[in-house]
Amino acid sequence: MVSVIISNRKINPITTTHDLINIIKPLTPSRFFRKYASKVFQAIRIEVNKELDVLKSFLEQTSELLLPGGRLCVISYHSLEDRMVKRYITNGNFSTTAKKDLYGNFSVPFKKIGKMIQPSAVELKENIRSRSAKLRIAEKI
């Protein structure tokens, strides 16, 4: 899909969302079009707004800004954000393993508080856009 969008963009610039939809539409099954289009627009928004870079920068600052006992509460709205938040809270960095100190002990700045919280049925009924929200809470050690 990306290669088709890029090749079409070389022929005619994409100036409106309608232009992009016209490129995407023939590439997707009609019953899944809305899902595919949403993902394309989400990817563009994430890249244009540098959302993952901003989140990473924010998380890196929290271990220095929060005092011991301070709480970090982060709501993520899609899997890329949630993975970053989860790894940072669990490992103190963005990789899959935590850093070790000179003695081989894991050195993490946060302690996870409870489980991830998702919207209740009542919240979903009142606010459908909350369906993908995940709240993670950690305490500075």
Where are these regions (language model features)?
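S-adenosyl-L-methionine-dependent methyltransferase catalytic core, i.e., the SAM/SAH-binding region
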Residues: 1-141
